[in-house]
Amino acid sequence: MDKRTEQAFAYLEKNEHSMMELLKNLVSIETPSADREANERIAAHLDTYCDALGMERQIHHFEKAGPTFAAWTRPQEKKPILLLGHMDTVHAVGKFGPEPFLVKDDRVY
């Protein structure tokens, strides 16, 4: 294993708990595509999270659709990385049962 890979695995191991908490928080905010309020909640959650990291961010609101969210860091000497995703879970609230995020036998469901 090369040095960069070792560093990446060490970082992941060191930060596993906080990353799992973030994932749990995000997954637990059910956001059906047509539920504008739910999508506003997850955008606000991401905004608060990224603000705490010192990131620049912006929520874009639309008249006929839920928001989009963008966050970025100030330019640095290193090459930028783009992460792209979606905030809606598509399915209706409650479709995944009482626990939309579950850890069982060291696996996340």
Residue ranges of model-derived segments:
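Acidic/His- and Gly-rich active-site-bordering loop/insert found
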Residues: 2-109
